[in-house]
């Protein structure tokens, strides 16, 4: 079963992502910020990481850079799920190593299609 780590500081977004993915048959663990996600990713190998960009303590772009610095996550798909729509932020995400970019509010079907594309 594909293991997914979803990081977002919004409880409602974490719940929506978790329910959407669990209903589709994925094993999902959530984190409330980038620091929490990084700790969980160091303890458990995930097949995919989904992260918000703007979070307290450690943001999503910092998380991507930290994960890409770990050989275990060098080729792991990392999707950003965010309200950020600027070309500059998307470029920063790509430069950090993000695999894809989804904008909130998101359509659950779009999330699932994007996930299937990167796995």
Where do the model's predicted regions map?
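Charged docking surfaces used in two-component/phosphorelay signaling
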Residues: 15-23
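Short hydrophobic/Thr-rich beta-strand motif most characteristic of the beta2 strand and flanking loop
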Residues: 25-32, 40
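Active-site beta3 strand of CheY-like receiver
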Residues: 45-50
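Active-site residues of response regulator receiver
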Residues: 52, 82
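Receiver (REC) domain active-site loop signature in two-component systems and cognate sites
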Residues: 55
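Short, glycine/charged-rich "phosphate-handling" switch motifs in NTP-dependent
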Residues: 99
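C-terminal output helix
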Residues: 106-115
